[in-house]
């Protein structure tokens, strides 16, 4: 079911004037699937007119069985056998994000909750990128949008730790080495990004500090 986010959501909740929003999400999902990215399979769009120009929407999607999102996996890392394949999950995640960028798709909200993982029959792992609402396929995605996706994902890791300080007081299941491993794998698959990435990350600490301040002031 579609809902507005932020302050708009508190006012308009699940009422929309834009009748094409779910159709655009369907289009991006189909483009992602054609590009080899595992994502949500949309089987139907339900559109209900409320009054005047306002509508409510529902997407009917095929369930991704036996999967878990990365927030749940990290919160219960000690209990989940899948976490033992952490290195493989990181590599597959880097590949999935790179594949998405290779077909020029920018994810509007790439964070841990929108990444699903599951075991495959061969003993490996499969990574799904979901919730492509408001995402867009560009003619050329460009380096800045790629980095915006990657930094958004990294910030969600930091945010998870900050919000669960008591749980992670002794150790956090994602180390700096893990974060570097993700970047190295992504660069390995996208060699054109090596030089601009080095320059971009020089200002990363300052950018990161600003986002942490915003979370403290604005509550995330």
What are these regions (language model features)?
Residues 102-112:
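Catalytic-loop of the protein kinase fold
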Residues 1-70, 98, 102-103, 195, ...:
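Conserved ATP-binding subdomain of kinase catalytic cores across diverse folds
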Residues 124-213:
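C-lobe/activation-segment region of protein kinase-like
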Residues 4, 112, 134:
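Short, glycine/acidic-enriched loop or turn micro-motifs at the edges of active sites
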Residues 50-54, 120-126:
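Short, solvent-exposed loop/turn segments that connect beta-strands within catalytic domains
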Residues 111-119:
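Conserved protein-kinase catalytic-loop segment immediately C-terminal to the catalytic Asp
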Residues 69-80:
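AlphaC helix of the protein kinase catalytic domain
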